[in-house]
Amino acid sequence: MIVKTEEELQALKEIGYICAKVRNTMQAATKPGITTKELDNIAKELFEEYGAISAPIHDENFPGQTCISVNEEVAHGIPSKRVIREGDLVNIDVSALKNGYYADTGISFVVGESDDPMKQKVCDVATMAFENAIAKVKPGTKLSNIGKAVHNTARQNDLKVIKNLTGHGVGLSLHEAPAHVLNYFDPKDKTLLTEGMVLAIEPFISSNASFVTEGKNEWAFETSDKSFVAQIEHTVIVTKDGPILTTKIEEE
């Protein structure tokens, strides 16, 4: 969507705050011994408290309030009886709507200590890639600069990007124009960023694989070689005064 009024801006900030609060609370609770279903129940309670609705359920009929992906799962992991263990690489992806306005956010992190430093490396580089990407976000610049920044960050750290998972427009639905915010440079994409445009920007940084495939069920994505993959995602509003991250809150 394109934000045109103060009311729209405040509505997007409100749902962004809610999604950030849910994401942070779930991350803080992700300790060895908890199940992904128990983590998802935290989201259910908070959505109810704040008067928000899970977007995966509302828009996609997804079997969970949030997507929780562990180790070999890259995205769209279904909350289940799976028990979190020390050293797991976990991704929590939270999207929701309130009063018709949406936000989408995600974070990858290592639970406690891992004996494989690559797990932490993909998380750190995903954060760097996101920061380098939003530095390119201003009205009149090319959308493709985002993907170029993400891909360059990965390459500089001897890592890959996942090419068939992308960011997207967001705001009045979970997925809207632009349909894809790529994590690599596409010279054919001439789309320009405009004032008020709302994007979900989400680098996926991989230890080796460049593509995901369908995993153990109809929802989850995995890599064929069990690469470690990390994602960082925020909902971003393009403005001439710099990007507004609706899903980043002060306590971070």
Swiss-Prot record:
CDD domains: MetAP1. Its cofactor is Co(2+); Zn(2+); Mn(2+); Fe(2+). Pfam families: Peptidase_M24. GO terms for biological process: proteolysis. Keywords: Aminopeptidase, Hydrolase, Metal-binding, Protease. A divalent metal cation 2 binds at residues 104, 168, 202, 233. InterPro entries: Creatinase/aminopeptidase-like, Pept_M24, Pept_M24_MAP, Pept_M24A_MAP1. A divalent metal cation 1 binds at residues 93, 104, 233. One of its GO terms (molecular function) is initiator methionyl aminopeptidase activity. Its EC number is 3.4.11.18. Binds 2 divalent metal cations per subunit. Has a high-affinity and a low affinity metal-binding site. The true nature of the physiological cofactor is under debate. The enzyme is active with cobalt, zinc, manganese or divalent iron ions. Most likely, methionine aminopeptidases function as mononuclear Fe(2+)-metalloproteases under physiological conditions, and the catalytically relevant metal-binding site has been assigned to the histidine-containing high-affinity site. It catalyses: Release of N-terminal amino acids, preferentially methionine, from peptides and arylamides. Coiled coil: none annotated. Substrate binds at residues 76, 175. Monomer. Belongs to the peptidase M24A family. Methionine aminopeptidase type 1 subfamily. Removes the N-terminal methionine from nascent proteins. The N-terminal methionine is often cleaved when the second residue in the primary sequence is small and uncharged (Met-Ala-, Cys, Gly, Pro, Ser, Thr, or Val). Requires deformylation of the N(alpha)-formylated initiator methionine before it can be hydrolyzed. PANTHER family: METHIONINE AMINOPEPTIDASE, METHIONINE AMINOPEPTIDASE 2. This is Methionine aminopeptidase. It comes from Staphylococcus aureus (strain Mu50 / ATCC 700699).
